[in-house]
């Protein structure tokens, strides 16, 4: 279709993954109606015929809203529950963006959940995989209400559970990484964090509580067998200052994510290789 702003295909739904995919595709088409001046959108919908009309209610479908820096009104950050910033694989951070995220966290008592590909080394960095991966115990700190998601593909298998997420990215694309995307902010990340920050805020309660829990669990780690995790445990405190660490995917990255790197050390990983093997 050469006149449509967006063309999507919605297949038959056989499971929850199909349902999630169709929800994203339908939202993508409807949002195209008003994006960059708007225009027609095309939905190619698969259907089958049934004479069963017994269904009286259909499941709720979530609308996804796109915002730009030119909007006169911005949605408010919910006050009912914790707020986290989740950073996937990210380009090198500027001091300006780091300061903007720090100010946002200080305003909303938020933490920044990172893995070693995130690149953020600011005041609110949390490497909480050890808390989030527990199966026989669940910390009340491992659940939040809102996730602000920036960055791309992540090697972090264990992350905090959130009720809904807002995606911030200049391309404005719908990337439902956590299955609960509600809003997309089509703008530079620094613009978003600056807008929602307040001057002279200094909240750190959530950050301090989560770090205290991480330290308690680290103290309980038993003697590990010779493994990738054992090597990470032994080497993380012996890395040269101002070095750059390059991880292989996926086991090495996942193992080292249990241990926070010393300040001044950056890590990289070619997460673009996920799925090729």
Predicted regions located by residue number:
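Short acidic-hydrophobic, aromatic-tinged amphipathic segments that line or gate anion-handling sites
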Residues: 6-13, 127-135, 182-197
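Structural signature of the thiamine diphosphate
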Residues: 8-60, 138-165
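Glycine-rich phosphate/diphosphate-binding loops that line cofactor/substrate pockets in enzymes
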Residues: 30-37, 73-83, 104, 235-241
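Glycine-rich beta-alpha junction loops
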Residues: 45-51, 89-91, 117-118, 172, ...
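A short, well-structured juxtamembrane/interface segment
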Residues: 68-77, 95-98, 138, 223-238, ...
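Glycine-rich, anion-gripping cofactor-binding loops and their flanking helix/strand elements
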Residues: 87-166, 262-277
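Phosphate/pyrophosphate-binding active-site segments
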Residues: 162-253
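Acidic-glycine-rich active-site phosphate/pyrophosphate-binding loop
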Residues: 246-266
